[in-house]
Amino acid sequence: MATITTPGYAHIQRQHGRCSTTAGRRGASNSVRFSARAVSSVPHAAAASSAPAFLPVPFVPGADAPSPSGKSAIGVPKAPRKGEEGKRLNFFQRAAAMALDAFEEGFVANVLERPHGLPSTADPAVQIAGNFAPVGETPPARALPVSGRIPPFINGVYARNGANPHFDPVAGHHLFDGDGMVHAVRIRNGAAESYACRFTETARLRQERAMGRPMFPKAIGELHGHSGIARLALFYARAACGLLDPSHGTGVANAGLIYFNGRLLAMSEDDLPYQVRVTADGDLETVGRYDFDGQLGCAMIAHPKLDPATGELHALSYDVIKKPYLKYFYFAPDGTKSADVEIPLDQPTMIHDFAITENYVVVPDHQVVFKLQEMLRGGSPVVLDKEKTSRFGVLPKHAADASEMVWVDVPDCFCFHLWNAWEEADTDEVVVIGSCMTPADSIFNESDDRLESVLTEIRLNTRTGESTRRAILPPSSQVNLEVGMVNRNLLGRKTRYAYLAVAEPWPKVSGFAKVDLATGELTKFEYGEGRFGGEPCFVPMDAAAATPRGEDDGYILSFVHDERAGTSELLVVNAADMRLEATVQLPSRVPYGFHGTFITGDELTTQA
């Protein structure tokens, strides 16, 4: 095993104007103003980890408005202009609003929250400090300066999702709680034509913007202990009085991005996806909440898997309130949905990601579970169940029901993300590649232990029911590897390489690594002192080909921010030799975010 570190690059210092949030809220003594101070190393998710949301609000598909295309099931309720909210409320609603606001400020904030302080996992001063802080929207900026040479084959849009709170928090806030914002760079003919960033216009954001303040509960930052119960009660009361409308969803769409069936979908697992369209001038516009033309009536997790061979999109949906706690389904290339397969679980479980092989889906059932009753005891509803044995379920992709699932125990294993999986017929094994995280619940709850994310090979023997597990990197080379991908043209098939963020110093990302999954050879690309980024996005040389010319024949795209200079860039790195090819100077600050994707030029022309 060898560890190879490639040099970073000579940074071109060029000052750009920073975006800053202009959204305010009515004064509250515990509101937090965003700053650009350096974030401390605390046990929340890595900058690029995606956001699991588990708002315990009954999911209501709702009767969404027609889309601009005329098809049903796409739409966001039109929000009134700011200042019109009070005009459309009747006397009872105005009185209820005043009473509930007084209850929130007088009891929830002053009695339940402020005297007790906040854990670091819910403290806005920690969670959204420095370059984790939000920015305002940026309309398309054109003709971006480029140092080096962008390979001419890269033709399309690199888009990355992230959490970007529109309003200052009024109480607890976790990095995962922010409103979704997509950042996009259009590349064509060796030039960086444009950059833009826009909020995904969720029903939640539109309503809060109309009211001029945050009103929906934040799933991780607020919903813990007695104050969390009180904030849930406030939410239900406001909805009952017609002050809020949860029927069009409560999600933030801040985690994943995928292009499927002519649509770029922004996702968080607490809601339906939202369709975002890339315009001809490189701008981003929200088409609306997308239910696959009336076929999808439940939330969908933020990491669906697109099979490169069949064109099918495979997905999961979990529920924290009622059974079935987990469902599996898939979509044909034309968007036709399969029947749901209800997967029996004894308790609601955090399932943020899963994997596919050529013939199977691989579903983790780990020890991080939801116990809403813990809020009654003053705790977090997300807990580590030490009595539970972690396991993986292997289910045929086109199974009629869960009776075809084979469960294999993998004790003391929690993989927040799974990078790939494949079948090895000679041994009746399914090989799963993921990052095993300890302490398993440290993203959500404070811990004195150092967080570790170990790249791991897990072998599931579906015949014997036994499993084995090995760390791919030796102890001498161990480094936290989180968020990344394999060559998407080989997803579900055996791969040699994975491209993963080096999540150190946690929770920042100081570079990315190319890992040989067979030998453990690690090649790092380091961003340099005071420079941090996020998820590496691998773009195959022929992004539309079913079979690449070489597995590592392509380029890595990643946003990077220089904390000393206050500037942000897009890097283009050769994945074969891990050398920098080009740097694109961006016109405004790009906060550390979550997951991204590359949309080819051909795909852009097929947008619905």
From Swiss-Prot:
Please tell me where Fe cation binds in this chain: 303, 352, 417, 595
| Recorded catalytic activity of this chain's protein | a 9-cis-epoxycarotenoid + O2 = a 12'-apo-carotenal + 2-cis,4-trans-xanthoxin; 9-cis-violaxanthin + O2 = (3S,5R,6S)-5,6-epoxy-3-hydroxy-5,6-dihydro-12'-apo-beta-caroten-12'-al + 2-cis,4-trans-xanthoxin; 9'-cis-neoxanthin + O2 = (3S,5R,6R)-3,5-dihydroxy-6,7-didehydro-5,6-dihydro-12'-apo-beta-caroten-12'-al + 2-cis,4-trans-xanthoxin
Quote one Gene Ontology molecular function term. metal ion binding
- Taking the record's annotation, the residue ranges forming a coiled coil are none
* Pfam families named in the record: RPE65
UniProt tissue specificity: Expressed in vascular bundles of roots and leaves, vascular parenchyma cells of leaves, anther filaments, xylem tissue of anthers, embryos, radicles and coleoptiles.
- Reported cofactor(s): Fe(2+)
Could you tell me what this protein does? Has a 11,12(11',12') 9-cis epoxycarotenoid cleavage activity. Catalyzes the first step of abscisic-acid biosynthesis from carotenoids.
Can you say what this protein is called? 9-cis-epoxycarotenoid dioxygenase NCED3, chloroplastic
